[in-house]
From Swiss-Prot:
It catalyses: an acyl phosphate + H2O = a carboxylate + phosphate + H(+). It comes from the Archaea. The lineage of its organism: Archaea, Methanobacteriati, Methanobacteriota, Stenosarchaea group, Halobacteria. It is an enzyme of class 3 (hydrolase). InterPro entries: Acylphosphatase, Acylphosphatase-like_dom, Acylphosphatase-like_dom_sf, Acylphosphatase_CS. Transmembrane segments: none annotated. Gene3D superfamilies: 3.30.70.100. Its EC number is 3.6.1.7. This is Acylphosphatase. NCBIfam families: PRK14444.1. Keywords: Hydrolase. Belongs to the acylphosphatase family. The keyword DNA repair does not apply. GO terms for molecular function: acylphosphatase activity.
Amino acid sequence: MAHTRAHVFVSGRVQGVYYRATTRERAQDQGVNGWVRNLDDGRVEAVFEGPDADVEAMVEFCHEGSERANVTDVEVEYEDPEGVDGFEVRW
């Protein structure tokens, strides 16, 4: 099974709307490793590592986000996995 890493930047109303917490819960349910954090410019940055299909499911989730989010753009860069273990919210 092939593994990949997606480095994602999400724009819109994505801070203060439980986007990071919801992303962490979904990633843990999906069995994907990585992290998520708020950026000073109002975007959310996330990294997902795992099997291709599971990482793609997380990228698709980023287009929706939490119930209160309003996503306007998702930028994705695919990279070689770095062996991240677990999933965390970074500050």
